[in-house]
A protein has these predicted regions:
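Generic structural motif recognizing short loop/turn segments at the entrances and edges of beta-strands
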Residues: 1-2, 8-10, 17-22, 27-34, ...
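Extended acidic/polar, glycine-enriched regions
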Residues: 3-65
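Beta-propeller domains with acidic blade repeats across secreted/periplasmic ectodomains
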Residues: 43, 48-270
Length: 270
């Protein structure tokens, strides 16, 4: 049995074919809030406590409270550069396979890192030479994220299925809300090679990513997404496997890998 309690607005349960039940919501310029209760038995009105929806929008308790620490091995200057070695916590209590796939930085210097298996970690460096790194798991369950960009201090992740924007609603260091910021029907390919790469922005706030056209039903291309995530367009097509998208002041650069008789094509979009 289906019970319906309308908390705000107008709605009712109407019967459908084969015993189905539909909820008909009356047109209204305001939001409609309702509670649906289900019972396996025939009852006059399924009961139960109504949970305030706002309580579900404030963020929940941390799921991954353990903070990991790894070492930094300072590099020796070599022809003007010193390459430090940042240790990755390959052994971790969550069994997370730490294959780093993308990274970007917050304004305070913290680093957001994604892994191919679908995690996002926040990495904080301790002050001073040789300071340790503190790793905190921020999100999990994303679909092979190969691009990450911090915009307005919010982590945006380019997975195989969409751009996801991550919100920490209660400031406890973990994402509570995984917002589907942008998705298109052409983005997912069944092939094992249908990868979607990178995530960059231009000065106007547009996003860019590239997608493989090799052994894939996707169009090998560079895609431009509007700052609000609502519109997208191809700005470069007929690319084989353009893994390597960079942003410079004059535009976007792409490197397309050659193979066999394929011709290397790198180009800049001004």
């Amino acid at each position: 049995e289906v019970g319906l309690e309308t908390l705000q607005g107008a709605a009712k349960v109407v019967p459908g074919a084969d015993g189905a039940r539909w909820i008909a919501i009356a047109p209204s310029p305001k939001a409609t809030e309702l509670a649906v209760r289900l019972s396996p038995e025939d009852v006059e009105q399924p009961g139960g406590e109504t949970i305030p929806l706002q309580s579900l929008l404030d963020g929940g308790p941390r799921r991954w409270p353990i903070e990991l620490q790894t070492a930094v091995a300072p590099g020796k200057p070599l022809e003007g550069y010193a390459a430090d070695l940042l240790t990755v916590p390959f052994a971790n209590p969550y069994g997370s396979w730490m294959r780093i796939s993308a990274m970007d930085f917050f304004q305070d210097g913290r680093m957001a890192v994604s892994t191919l298996s679908g995690d996002v970690w926040i990495v904080t460096a301790e002050k001073g030479p040789g300071g340790a790194l503190r790793w905190s798991r921020f999100a999990a369950g994303l679909y092979e994220p190969l691009g990450l960009k911090v915009v307005d201090e919010l982590v945006h992740v380019r997975g195989r299925d969409r751009i996801t924007r991550l919100h920490d609603l209660n400031g406890d260091g973990e994402a509570d809300y995984y917002e589907s910021f942008h998705e298109d029907s052409h983005e997912i390919g069944a092939s094992y090679h249908a990868f979607v790469y990178d995530l960059q922005c231009d000065p106007e706030g547009n996003f860019y990513y590239s997608q493989s056209g090799y052994k894939s039903p996707l169009t090998g291309a560079v895609v431009k997404v509007s700052p609000d995530g609502k519109r997208s367009s191809f700005i470069g097509r007929d690319l084989r496997n353009p893994n390597g998208l960079g942003s410079i002041a004059q535009g976007i650069t792409v490197a397309d890998n050659p193979s066999g008789k394929a011709v290397f094509n790198g180009f800049m979009l001004a």
